[in-house]
């Protein structure tokens, strides 16, 4: 991903620019030379903030400080992002009651942590002829978790396995 380039000082190619001061005060439209002289008198940089405007908008500011603040904002935004993982729990069509409840507890824990959960039911051998056992088991899991989770992907066959994805309910 290419970083957007910002023109500063002599890199600005417009003849006339709209100048905004360091404190966001409008200084008006002036020639590039006048704007550069004004920025130099204040010992600051002339930074082109809106090159597509007519005339382009330039701000008088300390460019080094501006870059530092932009990088800090970017770091804060990255820090606030939450990474949702998809955890997987595998079942079999003949999984007994207690084992199924244990697997449901695992899925419940994943959902409470804010992650999505993929519940996979693996068919082996001739079990594939009884798909209704698999869909019943996945429906049971969905029913047990309906208080804290919503089914994002309905049960679906993929090869010799049937899966569904459950996600945490969105809090209002």
Curated annotation (Swiss-Prot):
Subcellular location field: Cytoplasm
GO biological process: ribosome disassembly
Transmembrane spans: none
Alphabetized HAMAP family for the sequence: IF_3
The protein's assembly and partners: Monomer.
Similarity-based family: Belongs to the IF-3 family.
Protein known as: Translation initiation factor IF-3
